[in-house]
Amino acid sequence: MRILLTNDDGIHAEGLAVLERIARKLSDDVWVVAPETDQSGLAHSLTLSEPLRLRQIDARHFALRGTPTDCVIMGVRHVLPGAPNLVLSGVNSGANMADDVTYSGTVAGAMEGTLLGVRAIALSQEYEYAGDRRIVPWETAEAHAPELIGRLMEAGWPEGVLLNLNFPNCAPEEVKGVRVTAQGKLSHDARLDERRDGRGFPYFWLHFGRGKAPVADDSDIAAIRSGCISVTPLHLDLTAHKVRAELGAALGVEA
């Protein structure tokens, strides 16, 4: 099985090293094409206004000045000697759940693999803070992902669907199981933090607050909060089919 790895945290990210160890438990034919720099939050964006610069690190490790989407295209269309059987994207530092999947470069890497006709999985690891220090239990994803991915590959899933895996913030032995979940809903609270530089000119940092919102029992959020691994199937068809029919009826046209 040939596996292509990418991420959005960049070629030097610890989560990418974790992902490679996971992949090597599944196959010896593992390739890495990852961004030169952090591409978090760039979602499914492409680089169209400047050239893509590819740097070969060794026989199977490449860094690209581009987005996760660019990396998957480069891997499938140029770097690999043949089509991969699986694209793995991650392991992201922090969960990618609910509405956040629309911003996620990690999920986008798997999305692009799916668009190219390759089975694809995004992996993210929840974490916590101790003071100002981020504590990421990478060992949890590393311990549980290989067997879970193997089982998922054996079971298979439809074309046009990618799988979004999130691992809870706990030790490997404290994981309480696996749940197949729905994409949850977060309270969206985007904020701008305005500051001044040394010359007095304004600049801004974008950040997100988290308001309280009901959490559905079958959601990815509920699974992670309960200490379970969340497996969420996501499809590329964004059509709201029920609303399509309703709009057709309201307009008196075929839908």
From Swiss-Prot:
EC class (word): hydrolase
Please give the SUPFAM superfamilies that the UniProt record associates with this protein: SurE-like
On whether Hydrolase is a keyword of this UniProt record, the answer is yes
One Pfam family cited in the UniProt record for this chain: SurE
Under the heading Gene3D superfamilies, the entry gives: Survival protein SurE-like phosphatase/nucleotidase (3.40.1210.10)
What Enzyme Commission number does this protein have?
3.1.3.5
Provide the Gene Ontology terms for cellular component. cytoplasm
Names of the cofactor(s): a divalent metal cation
Tell me where the signal peptide lies: none
Where does the record say this protein resides?
Cytoplasm
Q: Cofactor note, please?
A: Binds 1 divalent metal cation per subunit.
Q: Which InterPro entries match?
A: SurE, SurE-like_Pase/nucleotidase, SurE-like_sf
This entry's Gene Ontology molecular function terms read: 3'-nucleotidase activity; 5'-nucleotidase activity; exopolyphosphatase activity; metal ion binding; nucleotide binding
Query: Out of the domains of life, which is the source?
Result: Bacteria
Report the catalytic activity: a ribonucleoside 5'-phosphate + H2O = a ribonucleoside + phosphate
The answer to keyword Nucleotide-binding applying to this record is yes
Report keywords, A-Z: Cytoplasm, Hydrolase, Metal-binding, Nucleotide-binding
Residues binding a divalent metal cation: D8, D9, S40, N92
> Family, per the entry?
Belongs to the SurE nucleotidase family.
What is the recorded function of this protein according to its Swiss-Prot or TrEMBL entry? Nucleotidase that shows phosphatase activity on nucleoside 5'-monophosphates.
From the Swiss-Prot or TrEMBL record, give the protein name. 5'-nucleotidase SurE
**Source organism per UniProt:** Brucella suis (strain ATCC 23445 / NCTC 10510)
In the record, what lineage is assigned to the organism producing the protein?
Bacteria, Pseudomonadati, Pseudomonadota, Alphaproteobacteria, Hyphomicrobiales
